């Protein structure tokens, strides 16, 4: 379990309020649970299982992403790192984000670091997830 938050500026609700978070996750149950949690903290959430889905959904709602979260092993057609990169390329500002994986390989860690994203390894507890996310907003 991670240490409790102690700094007053670390309130995730204050930091996520009004932020547009893109969530790339192919597992519908995980996607829904994560979306609900992010909405509880005040984020506007755009979800999908591919970059094409989330970019279309963001455009339909006229939203510009503040941050992207992607499962590394998204699908056979598009991995999470590629999908997050596509969202970044389509965003008119510098976009940061999190790549989440259970993969423990050094190669994946290096690939994520080269792409400029933060790697979180599963299982990720809520405090660690929120801390990493608020640092990327």
Language model features: what each stretch is:
Residues 65, 69-88:
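Conserved phosphotransfer microenvironments
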Residues 45-47, 97, 119:
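Conserved beta-strand scaffold positions in the cores of enzyme catalytic domains, especially
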